[in-house]
């Protein structure tokens, strides 16, 4: 089934209102296996809507119209669709009763003739009750095309879709199932190149790559009649992807850290620390507390994070972390030595299981002979301490700081998986 969404309202075209209904409807159609091929916004203009209906009816099996069902003069959707189909508007009894009750309970409201239009549907339509508003919706099939009329306010449209439209449409369709794989340490272009043959030959399931700041996700999607069938297909594709060799000689599984649209490296680390009843701390320079504040964003973080240090100036590093100023001056603020010592001392001073040190050059200028984007990350555990150098070039100052934290979380994650042994 080919579906099309038509959002009606001049305010959408002028940018006064964001077209969130189209996104919502597309997501819901995908859930029941209906393919949305087109999305269009049209103003409150009868001739342009008639022209669009003529086009849509020739290319789509399901046309979802939202907006223009209200009482004002520019609410023309219902009348225009009725005119296009050569049908009349009739009053829907339940909607009329709701309108009667609404005005009876509000005697100070004026019931003008245009209010009555909200209780009308196109003749032959199956009504879609409006739980939170007055404008009734409707479903009508004419010449093999199904027309759905919905009000514009999301607070009215969403309950109507969830409670009435989806059950009406879902009976004859397979559902769409998706799984999101998350990767860190590999760029989108490299990942897509490695999987190019698989992506080129895809049919069902499909692979869709998305680039995020510092990481990449792959959305695997399939249509199936049951969740079990979908899981079997997605499991097979996932294993094929993760077992694909990378350019570095390992497998793509080496870069895969988790699942889900809203998951993150920090969430993975926090969950792993909670599962192991371990604590973490950090001493930060270039990231200025971003690593620690990210941990503190999670509920219950006080059980795994006792406190930490933000040490920008070299003298503060020496004083707060109880380090020799002469050693810091000898090796430099931006150095493997300093990152390692920051991790060691933060762990020691807070009696934490893991200590992290972050120092580097966020820009815009180079520092101590290091280019912008040079970052040193220290990791300290009961089994020792080590520093790692990372280069994050061609990024803004804020992106460098954010990606540096991602690298730190990834190193902590791998260290936890390795039983606190350093990598």
From Swiss-Prot:
Signal peptide: none
Lineage top rank: taxon: Bacteria
Pfam families: CinA, CinA_KH, MoCF_biosynth
Coiled coil: none
NCBIfam families documented for this protein: cinA_nterm, PncC_domain, PRK00549.1
HAMAP family cross-referenced by the UniProt entry: CinA_B (MF_00226_B)
UniProt record similarity statement: Belongs to the CinA family.
Identification of the protein by name: Putative competence-damage inducible protein
Organism: Streptococcus uberis (strain ATCC BAA-854 / 0140J)
């Amino acid at each position: 089934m080919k579906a099309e969404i038509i959002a009606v309202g001049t305010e959408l075209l002028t940018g006064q209102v964001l077209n969130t209904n189209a996104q919502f409807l597309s997501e819901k159609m995908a859930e029941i296996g209906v393919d949305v091929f087109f999305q269009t916004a049209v103003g409150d203009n009868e001739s342009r809507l008639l022209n669009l209906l003529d086009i849509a009816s020739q290319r789509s099996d399901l046309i979802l119209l939202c907006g223009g069902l209200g009482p004002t003069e520019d609410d023309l959707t219902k009348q225009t669709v009725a005119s296009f189909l050569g049908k009349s508007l009739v009053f829907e009894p339940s909607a009329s009763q709701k309108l009667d009750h609404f005005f009876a309970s509000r005697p100070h409201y004026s019931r003008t003739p245009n209010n009555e239009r909200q209780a009308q549907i196109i003749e032959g339509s199956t009504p879609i009750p409006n739980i939170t508003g007055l404008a009734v919706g409707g479903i009508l099939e004419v010449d093999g095309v199904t027309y759905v009329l919905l009000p514009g306010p999301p607070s009215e449209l969403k309950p109507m879709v969830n409670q009435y439209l989806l059950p009406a449409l879902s009976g004859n369709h397979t559902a769409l199932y998706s799984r999101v794989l998350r990767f860190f340490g590999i760029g989108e272009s490299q990942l897509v190149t490695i999987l190019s043959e698989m992506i080129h030959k895809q049919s069902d399931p499909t692979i869709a790559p998305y680039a995020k700041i510092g990481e990449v996700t792959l959305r695997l999607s399939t249509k199936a009649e049951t969740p079990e069938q979908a899981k079997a297909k997605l499991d097979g594709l996932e294993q094929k992807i993760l077992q694909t060799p990378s350019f570095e000689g390992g497998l793509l599984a080496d870069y895969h850290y988790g699942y889900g649209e809203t998951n993150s490296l920090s969430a993975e680390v926090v969950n792993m620390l909670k599962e192991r009843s371990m604590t973490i701390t950090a001493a930060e320079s270039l990231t200025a507390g971003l690593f620690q504040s990210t941990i503190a964003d999670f509920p219950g973080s006080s059980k795994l994070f006792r406190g930490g240090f933000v040490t920008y100036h070299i003298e503060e590093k020496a004083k707060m972390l109880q380090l020799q100023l002469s050693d810091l001056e000898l090796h430099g603020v931006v150095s493997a030595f300093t990152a390692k010592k920051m991790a060691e001392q933060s762990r020691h001073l807070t009696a934490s299981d893991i200590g992290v040190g972050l120092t580097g050059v966020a820009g815009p200028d180079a520092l101590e002979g290091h280019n912008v984007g040079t970052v040193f990350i220290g990791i300290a555990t009961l089994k020792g301490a080590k520093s790692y150098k990372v280069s994050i070039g061609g990024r803004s100052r804020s992106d460098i700081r954010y990606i540096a934290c991602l690298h730190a979380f990834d190193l902590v994650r791998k260290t936890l998986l390795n039983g606190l042994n350093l990598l």
